Amino acid sequence: MQIGKIVKVSGPLILAENMSDASIQDICHVGDLGVIGEIIEMRGDVASIQVYEETTGIGPGEPVISTGEPLSVELAPGLIAEMFDGIQRPLDTFQEVTHSNFLGRGVKIDALDREKKWTFEPTVAVGEEVSAGDIVGVVQETPIIQHKIMVPFGVSGTIAEIKAGDFAIDETVYSVETAKGTESFSMMQKWPVRRGRPILEKLSPKVPMVTGQRVIDTFFPITKGGAAAVPGPFGAGKTVVQHQIAKWADVDLVVYVGCGERGNEMTDVLNEFPELIDPTTGESLMNRTILIANTSNMPVAAREASIYTGITIAEYFRDMGYSVAIMADSTSRWAEALREMSGRLEEMPGDEGYPAYLGSRLAEYYERAGQVIALGKDHREGSITAISAVSPSGGDISEPVTQNTLRVVKVFWGLDSQLAQKRHFPSINWLQSYSLYSTEVGQYLDLELQGNWAAMVAEGMRILQEESQLEEIVRLVGIDSLSDKDRLTLETAKSLREDYLQQNAFDDVDTFTSRTKQAKMLQLILTFGEEGQKALSLGTYFSELMAGTVEIRDRIARSKYLPEEELEKLDRLQAEIKTTIKEIIAEGGMTND
């Protein structure tokens, strides 16, 4: 391989000549330090290289060596509960090697531990036919995730030899007799991050993902295999929404990509997740989490790689048949990295200086999410759910990143700074947000809960929309101008907002609400509104209704803090609502006139 020579350094972009043997997307070692870079443009024998580390001190004349390989990730046991940087360097190992709390440059570290032994149990026998995607053995990586070792893409033949026992990830565990001869394989695969892993078939997602957040699960649900965007201004709670979903979503694995956001937020995850218990498995949340940290003070170019690194790892576990959620916080910082590199390459800018290909790059990322049938004999079904925060400057969702994102995602959770200022969290605006999965999820849950979930959700949304129209009248002519029925609608909507949609992420009980509890809580509020309207139509006064239901309304408000084991109390409360309102009808209204 030829050795190139640096001719220009411009921040994270380096131009090197004498690179005619190299190809686009090749990884290079740049300068005397050997920092890692990727070729993003070729003009004659001059390569433009985006460097994933700090370029301070690198100058013209220093060597550039191309590896001839694209940016790839290592896929093997040892990924879970690890924290990597944007190009899959393990941060704890980095600290052990460099004895520094800061990222040194040009440090060459294996992404996964080559020393640690894993117990490999074969699931196929010698002589069996295998092809790409077939499972040849399993490793119990964490108490809840069984790591399935799959035949690499492009390989098919007969098992010639397979071992059982404890092995490191780079030791040979099986060999396959192929048309070209016998090939040996370890537990590790490498895969280029910019290329999606092949699948057998893409399915239409229908199964809802339970997040435990009432406003999401009820009004704006997402399915396993769906894609959602969480745009909002600073301080509206994007990161807390993502952390909540990462903690409580009923998926098998979470890949959390901190892309250009504050380092403190990744520290929060590292401190909180090991202590929290997953409600579905009873194990520590860290046993199902992979972290990719590319904080705002890390090199800009590595942000661009971190999103691809995360989605490739997610695809690997999806191919095993797991449901995976990938959180990207935030894609706006990723788009800013694209904008910076595009500007340094002197490309023609599009809207607000972003490159013209911003939309296609975003679509490329989101289209790698979905519910699929993976390669392999057993037709495993797996899914990737992509949930990304978008940070539009000033909360302006008409800017290019948000608009291009909304074209490709089907769920929009719009965060509202006014709700956040009122301390209403999660501050998802129920009048602006939408989910295009609502119909499928409603039909699915009507069957699962054996009830009228879709009708309850529609009624709840109708009340909230009616409230916004009535508020206009109240602002103009005052609340006294409203009829008793309209005042009850406002009271029911207030209960929906404060007792149902508002949720305390820092309360041990309220942080997560099961689907059953959500249905019972929503039924309570709607029953109160429905029975109250009946009472008013029979002549009861609004003031009498409010005075007679103070204790009932207080108990509805406190129902969110009721533990999951005591849900039968909600059934009793529902019966009491009806009884209490019947007593008010019997005592009051026109009979006292």
Curated annotation (Swiss-Prot):
Annotated Pfam families: ATP-synt_ab, ATP-synt_ab_N, ATP-synt_ab_Xtn, ATP-synt_VA_C
Ligand binding (ATP): G232, P233, F234, G235, A236, G237, K238, T239
SUPFAM superfamilies referenced in this protein's UniProt entry, alphabetically: C-terminal domain of alpha and beta subunits of F1 ATP synthase, N-terminal domain of alpha and beta subunits of F1 ATP synthase, P-loop containing nucleoside triphosphate hydrolases
GO BP field: proton motive force-driven plasma membrane ATP synthesis
Keywords: ATP synthesis, ATP-binding, Hydrogen ion transport, Ion transport, Nucleotide-binding, Translocase, Transport
Enzyme class: translocase
Protein EC: 7.1.2.2
UniProt xrefs under InterPro entries: ATP-synt_VA_C, ATP-synth_a_Xtn, ATP_synth_asu-like_sf, ATPase_a/bsu_AS, ATPase_F1/V1/A1_a/bsu_N, ATPase_F1/V1/A1_a/bsu_N_sf, ATPase_F1/V1/A1_a/bsu_nucl-bd, ATPase_F1/V1_b/a_C
Record flagged with keyword Transport: yes
Catalysed reaction, written as an equation: ATP + H2O + 4 H(+)(in) = ADP + phosphate + 5 H(+)(out)
Signal sequence, start to end: none
Gene Ontology MF term list: ATP binding; proton-transporting ATP synthase activity, rotational mechanism; proton-transporting ATPase activity, rotational mechanism
GO cellular component, one term: proton-transporting ATP synthase complex
Function: Produces ATP from ADP in the presence of a proton gradient across the membrane. The V-type alpha chain is a catalytic subunit.
Family per similarity comment: Belongs to the ATPase alpha/beta chains family.
Stated name of the protein: V-type ATP synthase alpha chain
Taxonomic placement: Bacteria, Bacillati, Bacillota, Bacilli, Lactobacillales
